[in-house]
Amino acid sequence: MKFSSAFKFGATFVVACLFSLNSASANSYEQIKKDGVIRIATEGVYSPFSFHNEKDELMGYDVDIARAVAKKLGVKPKFIEASWDAMLAAFDAGKADVVFNQVSITDERKKKYDYSVPYMLSYSAIVVHKDNNDIKSFADLKGKRSVHSVNSMWIPTVEKYGAKLVVADSLSDQINLIITKRVDDTIDDAVMFYDYIKQHPNAPIKIIEAGDEPMYTAAIVKKGNKELLNKINNALNKLSKEGVLSEISLKYFGKDISK
């Protein structure tokens, strides 16, 4: 269900106010060890990263990594689920100790949060029909029909390279338009396409990794919570060396996107 911006703001404001009435600080590592629990904020509705399966079990790339980190820390994970805005409001209010939910690393967020070492690396990518040999990079998009949702973050890229915008809400709808050759392409984070191809291995499409700048995803903790950050970083580094992150990545994407 889609909400208007005004409703979304109002709902988020109410949630933030409710959290502020009973605000608490994010736990220190010592308190987490004492309690035996680390509180992890995540959305729970963002497949394949954080979602519920047919048995209503919480799973996903970020969720599995969070569980593996908790195990390395010797504590149990307690997941705090909420929509993106409400999730961050809960985290800001001290209701969670860490966020594992596809938080991309940006300079703006670095002012407010401390990031862990990255656990996902991806690039922007273009998807076209497997028979399309005209598009090999962003420079080839001029005059092409590029399909995106109405609020897509990729619309400025479409405009920059002179493509013609076609609107379709879901990724499946967008790719169906490509398969039927009613549009030429769509643009997104490459991992979204890896997931689609894993679910639809016979789809007549191909991925063109066109971005030069890597996009990193990491966990966030409260600014200054250095001991917890160091423990999470140590856990992630060990999981990487042991091949656990690669295994989780292959499970969800059929490709290693952990490094």
PLM regions: where:
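Short loop->beta-strand "edge-of-pocket" segments that line small-molecule binding or catalytic clefts
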Residues: 36-42, 138-151
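Short Pro/Gly-enriched coil loops immediately N-terminal to beta-strands
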Residues: 113-125, 141-142, 159, 170, ...
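Extracytoplasmic small-molecule ligand-binding "clamshell" domains
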Residues: 26-102
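Short helix-initiation/N-cap motifs at beta->coil->alpha
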Residues: 63, 79-89, 133, 151-152, ...
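A ligand-binding cleft/hinge motif common to bilobed small-molecule-binding domains
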Residues: 89, 103-111, 157-160, 184-213
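Periplasmic-binding protein-like
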Residues: 121-128, 194-237, 253-259
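Flexible hinge/capping segments at coil-to-helix
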Residues: 29, 129-145
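Ligand-binding clefts/hinges and TM-proximal coupling segments of bilobed small-molecule sensing domains
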Residues: 27-28, 153-166, 204-209, 234-259
